[in-house]
Design a protein with these regions (language model features):
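S-adenosyl-L-methionine
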Residues: 1-50, 56, 58-85
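Receiver (REC) domain switch-region micro-motif
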Residues: 24, 91, 143
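Short, well-ordered alpha-helices that flank and scaffold nucleotide-derived cofactor binding pockets
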Residues: 36-40, 62, 122-125
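Conserved beta-strand segments of alpha/beta enzyme cores
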Residues: 45-48, 67-68, 213-215
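Conserved short alpha-helix immediately C-terminal to the canonical SAM/SAH-binding motif I
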Residues: 55-59, 116
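Redox-cofactor binding/interface segments in oxidoreductases and associated redox assembly factors
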Residues: 72, 92-93, 145
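Class I S-adenosyl-L-methionine
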Residues: 80-88, 97-319
Length: 319
């Protein structure tokens, strides 16, 4: 509700797809949203969760006290040691999305950040090799990956060029001198449009080479009861011969569907907060355009405008 008490009415798990003894692993675990979804769907907390950030791990630990937490660089984790011979039934990864998001615009990208999805292949490869050597069955049976849908354009990076001179843009914002060699580490890197999606296709092919059937879809959060219209790319992969089953939307305008949840239903407007227009760092042009579009659509041109008026007593109420 508008007092901040809105909650989702997720159905309790009826038949878990996990087999006896299987565990759940959550990479890039933040506040615990994905882990909570997995818990509600599968009926158990993740056994292992990873993040390099102290605050993220702290929040996840508060929300999932039964999970063993590893605060470390995910590239340095030892899956064979941490799994300890237990079969991984579901393996989830939500790698950093900022270097694929359209909100990044023309800003420089990071090779290392964009490569984080490959960690999933590292886990799978190491566990498959251990299984082959030891006669175990620890490698993930089901894999899920969530990211912005622009990850479908994942490909190589190239140096950003000055539009006026055609020369390389350096990380300090200056333009390379004529004939100057700029090391890659000092270049502003942007996606190479000539090879858009090449690395994504290689990633999928690598999963398939490990015996996984792979599918992906772009899903809209508001179709499933969340108070946001954000679109996300979900990849599912499994190597047990079973079909991949996608959920059907539960919210929308079609007959029999639940009404979509508004973001306002999840907010408590009585809590004081600073204005986004008074922040030190100015809003991006794309954000300002979205705000203007929202004001036009939901306030100025709406027959039932959404307004939060301030009363003379200083309190707010939602119309």
């Amino acid at each position: 509700m508008a007092d901040g008490s809105h909650s989702f009415n997720f159905p309790a798990p009826q038949v878990s797809c996990l087999r006896p003894g299987e565990i759940v692993v959550d990479l890039f675990a933040g506040g615990g949203g994905a882990s909570e979804a997995l818990k509600q769907a599968l009926g158990i907390d993740p056994a292992l969760a990873y993040n390099h950030d102290e605050w993220a791990i702290g929040m996840h630990a508060a929300n999932h006290p039964l999970t063993i937490h590893h605060r470390e660089d995910i590239w340095h984790a030892d899956p064979r040691k941490d799994v300890a011979g237990r079969p991984v039934g579901w393996f989830h990864a939500s790698p950093d999305c900022t270097h694929f998001s359209q909100a990044k615009g023309g800003q420089p990208r990071s090779h290392k950040t964009r490569a984080l999805s490959w960690v999933a292949l590292k886990w799978i490869g190491q566990l498959l090799r251990a299984d082959l050597r030891d006669g175990t069955n620890t490698a993930p049976r089901i894999l899920s990956l969530e990211n912005v849908w622009q990850i479908l354009t994942w490909g190589p990076l190239v140096a950003k060029r000055c539009k006026a001179t055609g020369r390389v843009m350096k990380m300090d914002g200056t333009v390379a001198a004529r004939g100057e060699h700029v090391p890659v580490a000092n270049q502003q890197l942007v996606p190479d449009k000539r090879h858009s999606g090449r690395t994504w296709r290689q990633f999928v092919a690598a999963l398939e080479s490990k015996g996984y059937r792979v599918e992906w879809r772009k899903l809209t959060a508001s179709d499933f009861g969340a108070g946001t219209s954000r679109e996300r790319l979900f990849l599912l992969a499994r190597r047990d011969g079973q079909p991949i089953v996608w959920p059907a939307p539960t919210h929308g305008t079609a007959p029999g569907m639940q009404p979509r949840v508004r973001a306002a239903d999840c907010l408590d407007f009585s809590i004081p907060c600073p204005s986004i227009f008074t922040r030190k760092r100015p809003l991006a042009d794309a954000t300002l355009r979205r705000i203007a579009k929202g004001v036009m659509r939901h306030v100025l041109q709406s027959a039932d405008p959404f307004i939060v008026p301030a009363t003379h007593q200083g309190s707010d109420r939602v119309n």
